[in-house]
Amino acid sequence: PVDGQVWYNTTSNTVKANYINPGAWATGNSLNTTRYGLAGAGIQTAALAFGGLPPPAATGVTESYNGTNWTEVNDLGTARYRLAGCGATNTAALAFGGAISPEVLKNETETWNGTNWTEVNNLNTARFVLAGAGTNTAALAFGGGVPAVTAVTELWNGTNWTEVNDLNTARRKLAGVGASNTAALAFGGGPPNTAVTETWNGTNWTEVNDMGTARYSLAGAGTNTAALGFGGYSPTGVTETWNGTNWTEVGDLNTGRGYLGGAGTNTAALAFGGYITPGATTATEEWSAGPATVTFDNS
């Protein structure tokens, strides 16, 4: 179907029209463990949430989402918060970086096989509040705090991390999306709050059009040509969709928050956890957008 296309049924005397649903967030079932500064991987119907700060201490708690409910599974080997993660499903993910306190940064990397986390080779640069993209065998880690802001980018080939070309704008508390380590998008972050967006082609970062709303500690979902950015600080529900060229503001999260986790695509995303003054939340929301059909009759 094409947006704007209309069909008329001469038998039922009804008209159908195809249109693009701009999208909306709907409340889903909550996480079991309240936390913020967590990471996510997977898709809306098969997601993984891991790490974070409940508080008072960093956690390794991992939960798997089946499209309806969250179920606690085996913990990360290294408890940490403000880490990054990536992965195509809730059975194959990667966790890297993070901290157990602002003074104790981590470079540990762990891979998830659907049952257990296994420690693999470390990042070269220990850091927290970084972003990630890709899969558990082809990932990208970029930005973050060491604790000062950094532009360092590292590429994961399933065995080792290799430092590659830096971001153009050093920042932390940014978001990242992408299907592989050769095609990624970095957006938002700080300090100060920024709307800067950069796209990665496997070799270099290139600055492209900015987000509409500058913010940090936001989450993302999707790819470098079809992304969704949502949440952030000061706690906001602002959601923007990226079409490969421009950002467009769409429907807000019902629960505005920062330091949240994200997973999925730009038409079917998941937002979970995060921080709303005065503390962490278990709130989960599902994003739905894309082609839709409406039927009209003569009543």
Range-by-range predicted roles:
Residues 1-299:
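Polar, enzyme-active/binding microenvironments
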